[in-house]
């Protein structure tokens, strides 16, 4: 039945090739791709459910097949030591107890990766709005380590709107000034919500219209144009 259709497709885990795309999502994706290729610091901001993690999934899936190593961290209580050791673990390295030792080892591994493996590092940190000032300062400190006059890595920091509000405060101004690219994910207009639903249904094997225009408008109104609630709305 119709409920089964929703349960089957409006869930996480849809292959990246089948994700909904439009001009806005494409612009965010291209900005992130540019940040990765140029080893820049990018900020991705949007309310819960607006597609931050989806955008990051798409980026990672594309970069993984190229000359990049992509590392992903998402932890609300992230400390500088856990940050470095989390990255080292993903690189297959032994962790270090002291922050400075872990940082130095990471820099060493990055130099090998770039010089010998000819690979660029992309670090994605999700849930950035939950990070402490100490952790955000550590990110800036990491980026200040220069190799060949380039950044040692691309860093993509994603979080809810509170992250942007925090970075605009005077106490965080030095971090904000370090940001190279800003991406803001906004709720969908009605036409985008409709296209999003149709894309999901096509992936589910239902290319024909099964929702009325009024039903789609009701979904858009209920969800306020935010993709995640659309995905879990049962009509």
Predicted regions and their residues:
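Pre-Walker A adenine-sensing motif
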Residues: 25-35
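Conserved catalytic segments around the Walker B and adjacent sensor/switch elements
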Residues: 65-75
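Conserved NTP-binding/hydrolysis module of P-loop NTPases
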Residues: 9, 68, 78-97
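Helix-loop-helix "sensor" segment of P-loop NTPases
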Residues: 112-116, 147, 165-227
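Conserved small/polar residues in nucleotide/adenosyl-binding loops
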Residues: 1-9, 233-234
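Walker A/P-loop nucleotide-binding motif
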Residues: 41-57
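Sensor-1/coupling segment of RecA-like P-loop NTPase cores
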Residues: 131-132, 143-171
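Conserved P-loop NTPase "ATPase switch" module shared by AAA+ and STAND
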Residues: 113-133
């Amino acid at each position: 039945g119709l409920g089964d259709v929703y349960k089957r497709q409006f869930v996480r885990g849809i292959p990246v090739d089948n994700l909904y795309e439009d001009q806005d999502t494409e612009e965010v994706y291209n900005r992130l791709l540019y940040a990765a290729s140029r080893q820049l610091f990018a900020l991705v901001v949007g309310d819960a459910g607006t597609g931050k993690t989806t955008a990051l999934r798409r980026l990672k899936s594309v970069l993984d097949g190229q000359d990049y190593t992509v590392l992903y961290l998402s932890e609300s209580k992230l400390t500088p030591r856990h940050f470095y050791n989390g990255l080292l673990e993903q690189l297959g390295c032994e962790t270090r107890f002291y922050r400075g030792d872990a940082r130095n080892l990471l820099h060493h591994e990055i130099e090998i990766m770039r010089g010998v493996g000819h690979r660029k590092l992309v670090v994605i940190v999700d849930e950035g709005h939950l990070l402490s000032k100490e952790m955000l300062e550590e990110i800036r400190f990491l980026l200040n380590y220069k190799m060949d006059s380039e950044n040692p890595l691309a860093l993509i920091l994603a979080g809810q709107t509170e992250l942007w509000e925090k970075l605009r405060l005077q106490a965080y101004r030095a971090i904000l000034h370090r940001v190279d690219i800003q991406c803001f994910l906004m709720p969908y207009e009605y036409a985008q919500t409709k296209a999003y639903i149709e894309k999901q249904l096509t992936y589910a094997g239902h290319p024909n219209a099964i929702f009325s225009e009024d039903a789609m408008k009701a979904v858009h109104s209920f969800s306020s144009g935010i993709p995640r609630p659309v995905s879990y709305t049962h009509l």
